[in-house]
């Protein structure tokens, strides 16, 4: 109990992403620019889905939730990292570390569930178009959204409580730019082997099972697309689904490396790069992937800009 109390009273010292780089100012500038681009991109996408009635469909409702997660995930880590860099220190309180673990895990797991639901939406739209209005009615969409949040909260609560239950009575220096479960477990003076094994095992349920469901959904979609006679319908289906598959590959690839590959097989520098990838790079790319390849989003943006231009002229 004394060890636990000592842990509560102490701060963690985050080494930070920029300590491993010679050109710290340049890397900081790149991270800051990506953060702003991602924040603006996801905010604009949320706004367009909100104001354009043509985007009031199940697919865009789920996409708006993805944008919400992609706004929240970088907000948990990047402002704190930037503040530490500008102040020249990396101390974070025990409560602050717990908050980072909880909210990042919540949004990461919830986004993983959401990607499965988005693949189901595309499966129904392409393979069962006549039943789409029933299978993807508003109540079902709200249930999908709620389930992703519930699964995220439950998983985050369990992981945070177990991780912070271990005593951290040795080094308080976290070789990472935010408090994350794998990085903290390396500092514990207790035996964490069983929990690390449980993390890898749970990765099968949290990561590999959803990934297999997504692959199955898009396998059926691919079969249906190849049998389509209309070139326009085939092109639209391929464009939409390829965007989803790109997002899935970026998100799950980084998550599998971080949480299913044993810590002994990757260095802290690799952990920093991979964590930056799913906490900043992927949320920044997602709105670009969906908007650049989606004519409906472009039309909504043009419509909003046209209205703004007409108001200024009047």
UniProtKB/Swiss-Prot annotation:
Predominant location category: membrane
Annotated glycosylation sites: 5
Subcellular location: Cell membrane
Alphabetic keyword roster: Cell membrane, G-protein coupled receptor, Glycoprotein, Membrane, Olfaction, Receptor, Sensory transduction, Transducer, Transmembrane, Transmembrane helix
Extracellular side: 1-25, 80-100, 159-195, 260-272
GO MF term (any one): olfactory receptor activity
InterPro entries, A to Z: GPCR_Rhodpsn, GPCR_Rhodpsn_7TM, Olfact_rcpt
Keyword RNA-binding: no
Topological region Cytoplasmic: 50-57, 121-139, 220-236, 293-314
Classification via Pfam families: 7tm_4 (PF13853)
Membrane topology: Multi-pass membrane protein
Transmembrane segments: 26-49, 58-79, 101-120, 140-158, 196-219, 237-259, 273-292
Gene3D superfamilies registered for this protein in UniProt: Rhodopsin 7-helix transmembrane proteins
One BP term from GO: detection of chemical stimulus involved in sensory perception of smell
GO cellular component, one term: plasma membrane
Free-text function comment from the UniProt entry: Odorant receptor.
Similarity section: Belongs to the G-protein coupled receptor 1 family.
Name of protein: Olfactory receptor 2Z1
Naturally occurring in which organism (per UniProt): Homo sapiens (Human)
